[in-house]
């Protein structure tokens, strides 16, 4: 077999392959055997008809077509391996020549991983937020816990931020009621600022059974962007009542008997949470810095495929209802054009990151153990809410286990590279990235995941 490569662009190559008939005996034998099973010729057992009779019945062209179909995948794989082509995606293959008993020639065009220089991670410096398990952070965590066990009590004083109301809202333009912006019995927390612009300001200082009025620009619907008169009737007012931070609360909200024990545990929880956040920040900052120094083109077809996959996944959550997506975008205050643009940008970022990490993996050459792969599969199954055995069965059926192996390999390659980066926190303290990304730490994290 002979092959040659023509570089079409930084991200696409054309491979021309010639396969002599002398190398195609297994495929020829297989083609005749398959066709022989399809015909019953008097005087011969099924599957034992001579080749000249099969040629006469089906034509030599049918045999050659079967041979070509059988040989293409294997010979293509051999050619790109021999030429060192880092192919991504499916090739476009065209058989350009069939000379019976001489050779078969085909041409394959395929997207390839672009070549580029990796940055020197030793020269990268990043800054991440400092860990501050101070009293303020601890109190904030305890307040969050108190809020989970709070109760709502009726009151009749002037409303304040953080209190709750039940309201009826009526919107009108030039005296005409806007049905789509009108609702009754709506529960709302003052200060959440996620309903109507100006609502919080109007409610603060008001009392139960009062009606407040103001003007606001409608954010959604047929009258989006128009000024409307808003009338809000306050039918109920409530305030949050928090439990005392005492031993009784500790026993109610945790496994501890005293508030001192709960506070000590909260300190440890805050420190662990901030360490996890700091590790994630290091990873994100290093990856962003490294990608910023690596200049390479992206295969457009791969970007298009990624963008389509992202859109398909989102539509799947909406029962593949395109109109529902447009309604969702309108409720979020964005347009389909803006969404499509961001979807492509996200796809480009995802493809760029994967191509970068694939190249980094080849340089770092991390080893992935069976246990690491198993842990990652179990973690992924858990994130999808699937039974691990069922998930593994689906992976085997679809041939996706190799993809998860690559995910683990990319993560380990990046961890190895991060260990060479200079890291400081926002207070100027040096951080040893090996504390988070050393071999033992990475293995422990994956095991816990």
Swiss-Prot record:
<comment type="function">
    <text>Involved in protein export. Acts as a chaperone by maintaining the newly synthesized protein in an open conformation. Functions as a peptidyl-prolyl cis-trans isomerase.</text>
</comment>
<keyword id="KW-0131">Cell cycle</keyword>
<protein>
    <recommendedName>
        <fullName>Trigger factor</fullName>
        <ecNumber>5.2.1.8</ecNumber>
    </recommendedName>
</protein>
<dbReference type="Pfam" id="PF05698">
    <property type="entry name" value="Trigger_C"/>
</dbReference>
<keyword id="KW-0132">Cell division</keyword>
<dbReference type="InterPro" id="IPR037041">
    <property type="entry name" value="Trigger_fac_C_sf"/>
</dbReference>
<dbReference type="GO" id="GO:0051083">
    <property type="term" value="P:'de novo' cotranslational protein folding"/>
</dbReference>
<dbReference type="GO" id="GO:0015031">
    <property type="term" value="P:protein transport"/>
</dbReference>
<keyword id="KW-0413">Isomerase</keyword>
<comment type="similarity">
    <text>Belongs to the FKBP-type PPIase family. Tig subfamily.</text>
</comment>
<dbReference type="GO" id="GO:0003755">
    <property type="term" value="F:peptidyl-prolyl cis-trans isomerase activity"/>
</dbReference>
<dbReference type="InterPro" id="IPR001179">
    <property type="entry name" value="PPIase_FKBP_dom"/>
</dbReference>
<dbReference type="InterPro" id="IPR005215">
    <property type="entry name" value="Trig_fac"/>
</dbReference>
<dbReference type="InterPro" id="IPR008881">
    <property type="entry name" value="Trigger_fac_ribosome-bd_bac"/>
</dbReference>
<dbReference type="Pfam" id="PF05697">
    <property type="entry name" value="Trigger_N"/>
</dbReference>
<dbReference type="GO" id="GO:0051301">
    <property type="term" value="P:cell division"/>
</dbReference>
<feature type="region of interest" description="Disordered">
    <location>
        <begin position="428"/>
        <end position="449"/>
    </location>
</feature>
<dbReference type="InterPro" id="IPR046357">
    <property type="entry name" value="PPIase_dom_sf"/>
</dbReference>
<dbReference type="GO" id="GO:0043335">
    <property type="term" value="P:protein unfolding"/>
</dbReference>
<dbReference type="Pfam" id="PF00254">
    <property type="entry name" value="FKBP_C"/>
</dbReference>
<dbReference type="GO" id="GO:0044183">
    <property type="term" value="F:protein folding chaperone"/>
</dbReference>
<dbReference type="GO" id="GO:0043022">
    <property type="term" value="F:ribosome binding"/>
</dbReference>
<dbReference type="InterPro" id="IPR008880">
    <property type="entry name" value="Trigger_fac_C"/>
</dbReference>
<feature type="compositionally biased region" description="Basic and acidic residues">
    <location>
        <begin position="428"/>
        <end position="437"/>
    </location>
</feature>
<dbReference type="GO" id="GO:0061077">
    <property type="term" value="P:chaperone-mediated protein folding"/>
</dbReference>
<keyword id="KW-0697">Rotamase</keyword>
<dbReference type="InterPro" id="IPR036611">
    <property type="entry name" value="Trigger_fac_ribosome-bd_sf"/>
</dbReference>
<keyword id="KW-0963">Cytoplasm</keyword>
<dbReference type="GO" id="GO:0005737">
    <property type="term" value="C:cytoplasm"/>
</dbReference>
<feature type="domain" description="PPIase FKBP-type">
    <location>
        <begin position="162"/>
        <end position="243"/>
    </location>
</feature>
<keyword id="KW-0143">Chaperone</keyword>
<feature type="compositionally biased region" description="Acidic residues">
    <location>
        <begin position="438"/>
        <end position="449"/>
    </location>
</feature>
<dbReference type="InterPro" id="IPR027304">
    <property type="entry name" value="Trigger_fact/SurA_dom_sf"/>
</dbReference>
